[in-house]
Amino acid sequence: MAAAPSHPAGLPGSPGPGSPPPPGGLDLQSPPPLLPQIPAPGSGVSFHIQIGLTREFVLLPAASELAHVKQLACSIVDQKFPECGFYGLYDKILLFKHDPTSANLLQLVRSAADIQEGDLVEVVLSASATFEDFQIRPHALTVHSYRAPAFCDHCGEMLFGLVRQGLKCDGCGLNYHKRCAFSIPNNCSGARKRRLSSTSLASGHSVRLGSSESLPCTAEELSRSTTDLLPRRPPSSSSSSSSSSFYTGRPIELDKMLMSKVKVPHTFLIHSYTRPTVCQACKKLLKGLFRQGLQCKDCKFNCHKRCATRVPNDCLGEALINGDVPMEEAADYSEADKSSISDELEDSGVIPGSHSESALHASEEEEGEGHKAQSSLGYIPLMRVVQSVRHTTRKSSTTLREGWVVHYSNKDTLRKRHYWRLDCKCITLFQNNTTNRYYKEIPLSEILAVEPAQNFSLVPPGTNPHCFEIITANVTYFVGETPGGAPGGPSGQGTEAVRGWETAIRQALMPVILQDAPSAPGHTPHRQASLSISVSNSQIQENVDIATVYQIFPDEVLGSGQFGVVYGGKHRKTGRDVAVKVIDKLRFPTKQESQLRNEVAILQSLRHPGIVNLECMFETPEKVFVVMEKLHGDMLEMILSSEKGRLPERLTKFLITQILVALRHLHFKNIVHCDLKPENVLLASADPFPQVKLCDFGFARIIGEKSFRRSVVGTPAYLAPEVLLNQGYNRSLDMWSVGVIMYVSLSGTFPFNEDEDINDQIQNAAFMYPASPWSHISSGAIDLINNLLQVKMRKRYSVDKSLSHPWLQEYQTWLDLRELEGKMGERYITHESDDARWDQFVAERHGTPAEGDLGGACLPQDHEMQGLAERISIL
């Protein structure tokens, strides 16, 4: 659209008065060609609206005013020319009627009565339209769920969360955080709309007339066809019950003010990012652990160092803090809207009270029909949350070094030459470099030390001494041979080659340290000043090297969480398997370091069969190593690997009881876990009814019985509403998490639909418990879940009240728990006082325990339990 300074001008491609007719076009100086006479479907005036070379046949109701005609014209511009639309288009257009009998061909339409049947009305852009008007094009933002990692196009940071992570513009397709909504400039390009501009408004049943005409459509049809294409205002508090919620960018007045500001070059400073961020110039990820890129100190623009020279000089100065929205604009948003936009928690998961999203599957064109059917239910499927990503163990280790090596030992002084291959777990001595047959394996976990050549008593007379020694508990290996004055002797004997093997073995013994922190020249890599804290006997020893006590396997990644990576390991002397959490101090701030120390301090004070055992902690200037007992797997793995994607009631009762008993011990010591979820419930064995232990106390807090805390902790998918709403919370926070764990165990889905407020869903039991699978689950289980998922903390069940619930007080569950206690050799779940009660129960049942209704409830699950046991064994 081009503004006409002195006389009205047509919209794109429109010929003005007195201009020659375009080739093959229409001569507007002569009477227009006879238009097809299509009878109007009802009372009203039918006429053509022409914009450039495009005509649309519309039907105007008889009682309509000129404003209605202008709205139709704006709708056509949005549909046919989205790149030409701008803010305030309605006030900047004029309507002219073609009158071939008049000296002035175009007659200004001043009212709807001026339009007669069959007229041709030209839409013309007024000369009052300014350059700023063309630049202001508001976004039409809707809440969107992303199935792949996405980044905010305003701040460059990743959109975090399971579902509803951010906002997507219906016009240009750009993505934004909800918290960035009020800072987004109104610069929608309409790229997505432009793909639709070649279709007619009545595309479902239209026939093109001439080059650009279509069948008539009524005003209602035209409005409906363009509803989804027009930028919409955010909903007011009175319309909060609508099926969809929309956001717009910053106020138009602010955009006009910023356009008048002088744009200056950016002031870039090197910046370290704590969240994944993309360069806003090239849209590529800023890679690295720290100092990844440059950030403008005024407008916070992020880019690579190499892209800084290509960034235009368009800095608008210091960004407004909480000042982007005037009071009158903020008044249009409900309180729930404001809290959901300003709350940092929205990047981590589902938030009670946040905006809903209608027909999630309909907004994602790339999804298949199968997913659409699943999404129509609206329940979030159970998955491993982003904060605790599980990794599988690689079957084959990476070869670190290989080659021919000469060696002998204190058990056999005969010198041998084998092809050595070093990987992350062992040294394998092959017969040659082409066969799989090997002579010996030396596990790295059995190596106690690698020392320079010291013992020469076994060197045969007249032979060259060895270069270094590998010391294990039973055997000492003497490796290499030092040829006199020949640094590059035969293969496997050269001093340089053997020294390379010594260095490689030292690095393999503690490779996790050396991944990010190369040692200084002349300094032994893994010999660092360290502090060892033994939890079992509370001994603190200085200058203890973890490599002398444990072997860590870097290719056996057990998991990764908030504070670091968990590797498999082995105690060198006893051969006991352990799990080692390795944390790089340089990668997290002091606050998270204090959380780690908090976890260690809590685990030091806990000794319970239902809580993971912490052995010791090692600390170096660069890293922290937390050594714990290694378990078989986690509860989430058991749920996802089951045949139906959920657990039978009998097994769920067995596991939930153990979780509650462990929580009772924690709460007795005034400790609240704060991050309870299936990933943090570990299985001690592959048995179908395993012992479980709680782990990951990084978020745990010391909270008294009647005390409250306000700091935000935990994983949002399992957190209670009071935490997500920044209200005070107490130990009942863990009980909400138990309710969610119980729900996902029995159903395989999270209990909340993403489209409604949690409070509303809890009060609507029919919505929370759909027939599949809850029609096959007992009412007692549903009753316990309802009492755990109580929004009001005072109504939520405690640990003791949950353990006393009839659903858990079942004879078969008691038998399963007693069998587990018999295997463990310790009674810590059940109590002796219950024996008499269950003996009386058996006597009343005529000595046939678990018969009748109890036995009938358990028999159908035998097949499921057998299949689940097989899957756990495979895992």
Swiss-Prot record:
SMART domains reported for this sequence: C1, PH, S_TKc
Domain of life according to the entry: Eukaryota
Ranges of Low complexity composition bias in the record: 1-12, 236-245
Domain Protein kinase residue range list: 552-808
Protein name per the record: Serine/threonine-protein kinase D2
Motif (Important for ABL1-mediated Tyr-718 phosphorylation) on chain: 725-727
Family statement: Belongs to the protein kinase superfamily. CAMK Ser/Thr protein kinase family. PKD subfamily.
